[in-house]
């Protein structure tokens, strides 16, 4: 059983049940999932291994009194984080004590409903930092490698929206340092299969451990494209008890890959969920373009699933080329019947700071306050052009039906038209005289 990248993929009890049933679990060992999948225990493991972590609480925060003490010690702003799960669920930023009680209650409730555990802890909320993660791969023979980094700073409410590899600011030396820390964490936990070690990176190139995702990531295709390594295939090899087919020396990053998560959300209405039926669908294609989607004409988008409905991934030799290719692919992506966040992605790609690689985890908040909504989406402009064209055709057809051309062109001077007479020319002259 391969669990994909949903919440079951991180559920150690489910993994153990699969194994106990005599089936092959294509994923990390349940023991490693329990150690690293829980953010608090992963934090302890990282600290024991000497990995720098974000300042925070080392125990769960259960009630308001504990929350006040922890927040006072760490210093505002603080980030309340669910110990289980991921995907931005059970997380709240608190900037003052007056916000603490409501945020704690909401985070605990959301964590409980999402992951079956309401355990939360506190971290210092670091601002003006990047979110950079390292893809790791390990086998059961004690070999682990890293496949480079992904830049994941473009996110909203702690949910990633755009990912790319390599990061615009990570050079070979920093990649090696972050990669070695990620590999050490995997080996210390006797990890096997695919996983992701997430870090915060500050402007001085200091990095801090965040958490480990003990599963395949949504954004794994960007790493596959720049490394040429099929991560899922390696997962199958590891699940069969085979060693990795690659070594660290085999891994080279080539070109640049970008992924945009396409969601059924209306960016013009505060990203409200958009429900409905897919009326028409036109997916982009061509060299270096990949679409992961289950959309089809007539398909329903309901409230019962995550709003992400597709992933659009591109690869090109350079980041600049990849940005151009992604923009073209987004402009060609036609989804009718529901609203999507494609206009948002187009706006980000047109942003100068983003194009220059200047971003942090607060990018989207700033971007949304800059009036980007005043710029028309390419889809809107396309519809306007099409409507204008069709309108002109309708008007011309009415004129034809009304006898403006009437079979033979009618002479303007009452005389018969010459053999050089043109119905289009006559119609044009009549239009000019109206």
Where are the predicted features?
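N-terminal beta-alpha lobe that positions the nucleotide/phosphoryl donor
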Residues: 2-197, 201-217
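Catalytic cores of soluble metabolic enzymes centered on carboxylation/carboxyl-transfer
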Residues: 182, 221-434
């Amino acid at each position: 059983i391969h669990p994909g990248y949903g919440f079951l993929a991180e559920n150690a009890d489910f993994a153990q049940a699969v194994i106990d049933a005599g089936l092959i679990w294509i994923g990390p060992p349940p023991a490693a999932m329990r150690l690293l999948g829980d953010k608090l225990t992963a934090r302890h493991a990282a600290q024991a291994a000497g990995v720098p972590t974000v300042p925070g609480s080392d125990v769960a925060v259960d009630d308001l009194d504990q929350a006040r003490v922890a927040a006072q010690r760490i210093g505002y702003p603080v980030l309340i984080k669910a110990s289980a799960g991921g995907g931005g669920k059970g997380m709240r930023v608190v900037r003052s004590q007056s916000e603490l009680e409501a945020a704690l209650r909401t985070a605990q409730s959301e964590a409980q409903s999402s992951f079956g555990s309401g355990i939360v802890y506190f971290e210092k909320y670091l601002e003006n930092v990047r979110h950079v993660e390292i893809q790791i791969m390990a086998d059961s023979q004690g070999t682990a490698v890293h496949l480079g980094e992904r830049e994941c700073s473009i996110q909203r409410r702690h949910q990633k929206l755009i990912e790319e590899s390599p990061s615009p600011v990570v050079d070979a030396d920093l990649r090696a340092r972050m990669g070695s820390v990620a590999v050490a964490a995997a080996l210390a936990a006797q990890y096997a299969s695919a996983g992701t070690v997430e870090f915060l990176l500050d402007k001085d190139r200091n990095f801090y451990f965040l958490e480990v995702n003990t599963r395949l990531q949504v954004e794994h295709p960007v790493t596959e494209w720049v490394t040429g390594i099929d991560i899922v295939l390696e997962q199958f090899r590891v699940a069969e008890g085979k060693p990795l087919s690659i070594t660290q020396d085999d891994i080279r990053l080539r070109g640049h890959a970008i992924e945009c998560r396409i969601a059924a959300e209306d960016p013009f209405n505060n990203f409200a969920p958009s429900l409905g039926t897919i009326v028409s669908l036109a997916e982009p294609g061509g060299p270096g373009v990949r679409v992961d989607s289950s959309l089809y004409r007539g398909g329903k988008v309901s409230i019962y699933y995550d709003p992400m409905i597709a992933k659009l991934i591109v690869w090109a030799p350079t980041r600049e080329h990849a940005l151009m290719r992604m923009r073209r692919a987004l402009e060609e992506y036609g989804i009718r019947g529901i609203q999507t966040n494609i206009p948002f992605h187009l706006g980000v790609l047109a942003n100068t700071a983003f194009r220059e690689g200047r971003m942090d985890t607060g990018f989207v908040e700033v971007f949304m306050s800059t009036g980007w909504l005043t710029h028309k989406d390419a889809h809107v402009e396309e519809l306007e052009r099409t409507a204008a064209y069709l309108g002109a055709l309708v008007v011309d057809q009415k004129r034809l039906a009304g006898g403006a051309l009437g079979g033979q062109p009618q002479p303007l001077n009452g005389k018969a038209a010459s053999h050089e007479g043109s119905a289009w020319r006559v119609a044009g002259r009549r239009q000019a005289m109206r």
